[in-house]
From Swiss-Prot:
Single GO molecular function: proton-transporting ATP synthase activity, rotational mechanism
Pfam families on file: OSCP
Record's subunit section: F-type ATPases have 2 components, CF(1) - the catalytic core - and CF(0) - the membrane proton channel. CF(1) has five subunits: alpha(3), beta(3), gamma(1), delta(1), epsilon(1). CF(0) has three main subunits: a, b and c.
Superkingdom of the source species: Eukaryota
Keywords assigned: ATP synthesis, Hydrogen ion transport, Ion transport, Membrane, Mitochondrion, Mitochondrion inner membrane, Transit peptide, Transport
Record has Glycoprotein as a keyword: no
InterPro entries reported for this sequence: ATP_synth_OSCP/delta_N_sf, ATPase_OSCP/d_CS, ATPase_OSCP/dsu
Family label: Belongs to the ATPase delta chain family.
Stated name of the protein: ATP synthase subunit 5, mitochondrial
Known role: Mitochondrial membrane ATP synthase (F(1)F(0) ATP synthase or Complex V) produces ATP from ADP in the presence of a proton gradient across the membrane which is generated by electron transport complexes of the respiratory chain. F-type ATPases consist of two structural domains, F(1) - containing the extramembraneous catalytic core and F(0) - containing the membrane proton channel, linked together by a central stalk and a peripheral stalk. During catalysis, ATP synthesis in the catalytic domain of F(1) is coupled via a rotary mechanism of the central stalk subunits to proton translocation.
Location(s), subcellular: Mitochondrion; Mitochondrion inner membrane
A single GO cellular-component term on record: mitochondrial inner membrane
Species of origin: Kluyveromyces lactis (strain ATCC 8585 / CBS 2359 / DSM 70799 / NBRC 1267 / NRRL Y-1140 / WM37)
């Protein structure tokens, strides 16, 4: 459940007609969407994103802090102390402070990393940036990466007036070819996929 202070922030944002650019699913997506809506009204999406990034960097540099956030046995009092300490140390945006309080209240501080990742999807969409990944068996060289990037940017998968944010993910198990994922669409051109399809056809023929 969300805390009352966060609910009030979301309600105020909803009245202003602020609508998240994309729909997210899962508990982390719900929290990220609530933060986006609240930040749009109370401060700004950019301020919340900046605070989340600063928070992410702080946690990444401190393995002890990471362990604390992921510890479900932490008492409610200790969780609140952690949140207060982080808020003061980083000077967090108010909407992000409220988010941390909600996560602490519900013993879900371990979701912070996932919420941050989901929030990035919202801010990218908000700024007209389309996230995409191209998965290959080996890293793409810069020339081939740019060719794939250019082709995707001009395709209907991205759309006019939008920018592309492409990432190359390496998975040797696909054996060759590539898998392109843009938003919720996937184009699987991997060798592994072709082999699976061939095996399926052979099984059906027997």
């Amino acid at each position: 459940m969300f805390s009352r202070v966060f609910v009030r922030s979301m309600a105020a944002s909803a009245k202003a007609g602020v609508k998240p650019p994309v729909q997210l699913f899962g508990l982390d997506g719900t929290y990220a969407t609530a933060l986006f809506t609240a930040a749009s009204k109370t401060t700004s999406v950019e301020a919340a994103a900046s605070s989340l990034n600063a928070l992410k960097e702080t946690v990444a540099k401190d393995t002890k802090l990471t362990s604390i956030l992921e510890n479900p046995a932490l008492s409610a009092e200790d969780r609140n102390i952690v949140v207060d300490t982080l808020s003061k140390k980083i000077n967090l945006d108010q909407s992000v402070q409220n988010l941390l309080k909600v996560l602490a209240e519900n013993n879900r501080l371990s979701l912070l990393e996932h919420v941050t990742s989901q929030f990035s999807k919202l801010t990218d969409a908000y700024h007209g940036l389309v996230q995409a990944t191209v998965t290959t068996a080996q890293p793409l060289d810069s020339k081939l990466f740019k060719r794939v990037e250019k082709a995707l940017a001009a395709s209907s998968l991205v759309g006019k007036g939008k920018s592309l944010k492409l990432e190359n993910v390496v998975k040797p198990e696909i054996q060759g070819g590539l898998i392109v994922e843009v938003s919720d669409r996937t184009v699987d051109l991997s060798i592994a996929s072709r082999i699976n399809k061939l095996n399926q056809v052979l099984r059906e023929a027997i």
